[in-house]
Amino acid sequence: MQTQVLFEHPLNEKMRTWLRIEFLIQQLTVNLPIVDHAGALHFFRNVSELLDVFERGEVRTELLKELDRQQRKLQTWIGVPGVDQSRIEALIQQLKAAGSVLISAPRIGQFLREDRLIALVRQRLSIPGGCCSFDLPTLHIWLHLPQAQRDSQVETWIASLNPLTQALTMVLDLIRQSAPFRKQTSLNGFYQDNGGDADLLRLNLSLDSQLYPQISGHKSRFAIRFMPLDSENGQVPERLNFELACC
């Protein structure tokens, strides 16, 4: 049984966007294969939200900058005694390859944006009950196509995101691994510290405490307030131990 809960909190806008994209891409595959209306709406709603996120910022530009930054960080370890040089070289080559694929790919989300079925469903998602069969006969008949035909189309849609997914996964993995967890203690439910130009906070908290963190701040300074899940009867101990990584 799980005894700890991992919380992550972005300390800047680019990280906030990346975590949202990662979450939405993960949600695309949760209910696959699509076998009914509920599964279809879950899928198309996440596709729609992904496209909304893509339209708000320069996702590709920020990712390419980060891929380059991670390469420069790794290059500082070349020739350092005790460091696995083959591993460093392999990571640098993987980052370069991910960048090349991303920069040559079509506009992120364009393939999904131009799909007729996705466009029709997106138009109805904001309307309460707007995806009934009489509102969306196209979706209704799509759900009655052979399963293999639907699966193939869904795989094609998801594959169109592969250049983004590959680059984002590499970047987030390297950022998450960039700092170890350290034991910390809050006093009366409060903890604050300097971020040291971190992009991401990762916090491990015992499930037994039934507390959750409210985090505020930015890359240079942050504060954590621990709150009880039971807002009426829950209590926050005077001293609370937890693990924190500033990545």
Curated annotation (Swiss-Prot):
Alphabetized UniProt keyword annotations: Cell cycle, Cell division, Cytoplasm, Septation
Record-linked Pfam families: ZapD
One GO term describing the cellular component: cell division site
Domain of life per record: Bacteria
GO biological process, one term: FtsZ-dependent cytokinesis
Location in the cell: Cytoplasm
PANTHER family given in the database record: CELL DIVISION PROTEIN ZAPD
Annotated family: Belongs to the ZapD family.
Subunit structure as annotated in this protein's UniProt entry: Interacts with FtsZ.
Role noted for this protein: Cell division factor that enhances FtsZ-ring assembly. Directly interacts with FtsZ and promotes bundling of FtsZ protofilaments, with a reduction in FtsZ GTPase activity.
The protein, known as: Cell division protein ZapD
